[in-house]
């Protein structure tokens, strides 16, 4: 078995599509649609720092195939009223550390009220805290059985090293971990707060 790791790519889909492009492999419409979808989501709609001219060249290569790009965006980002209300109730629970790390801690009861799986709350809600003015690190803690799922994001700091400290990992500015309990989540919050404090 072989493993290909190249952290300079914004996404695995970008890496795969670039392989296909470079090697002259045939990419059918369905494959192009799937790869383009991964490129869009993992690049934050082409907004993250990892996006480069290579990203856009790969996107252009995929867009030469026949699929509905607008349908992808509609499926990913257009929401019904129930979903918007769910996000509003989530956002009402946002709290802040001393150094402005935004976070939400969702108990099992909170998850049940939202009518979503713990994974959907954890991964699906974390970016509702993105783009808050003055916030450069945000964390989403979600109870799942006897564990706590944690998603970390930042627009400025290397939060991956904090995730690794707690047995997790990911990317420089988008990482996660599975924690033992709420106390461990609070310890992680202190580490995130210290990370921001040391950079001020």
Annotate each language-model stretch with its function.
Residues 43-200:
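Hydrophobic helix-and-loop "lid/oligomerization" segment in the mid-to-C-terminal part
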Residues 1-58:
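Short alpha-helices
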């Amino acid at each position: 078995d072989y493993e290909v790791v190249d952290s300079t790519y914004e996404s695995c889909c970008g890496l795969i599509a670039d392989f296909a492009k470079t090697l002259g492999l045939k990419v059918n419409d369905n494959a192009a649609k799937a790869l383009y979808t991964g490129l869009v989501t993992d690049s934050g709609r082409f907004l993250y720092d990892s996006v480069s001219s290579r990203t856009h060249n790969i996107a252009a290569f995929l867009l030469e195939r026949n699929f509905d790009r607008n349908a992808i965006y509609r499926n990913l980002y257009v929401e019904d009223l129930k979903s918007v209300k769910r996000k509003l109730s989530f956002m009402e629970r946002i709290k802040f550390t001393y150094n402005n790390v935004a976070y939400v801690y969702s108990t099992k009861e909170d998850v049940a009220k939202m009518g979503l799986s713990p994974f959907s709350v954890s991964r699906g809600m974390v970016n509702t805290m993105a783009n808050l003015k003055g916030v450069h690190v945000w964390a989403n803690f979600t109870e799942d059985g006897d564990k706590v799922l944690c998603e970390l994001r930042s627009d400025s700091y290397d939060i991956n090293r904090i995730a690794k400290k707690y047995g997790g990992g990911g990317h420089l500015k988008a990482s996660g971990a599975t924690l033992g309990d709420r106390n461990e989540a609070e310890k992680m919050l202190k580490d995130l707060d210290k990370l921001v404090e040391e950079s001020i």
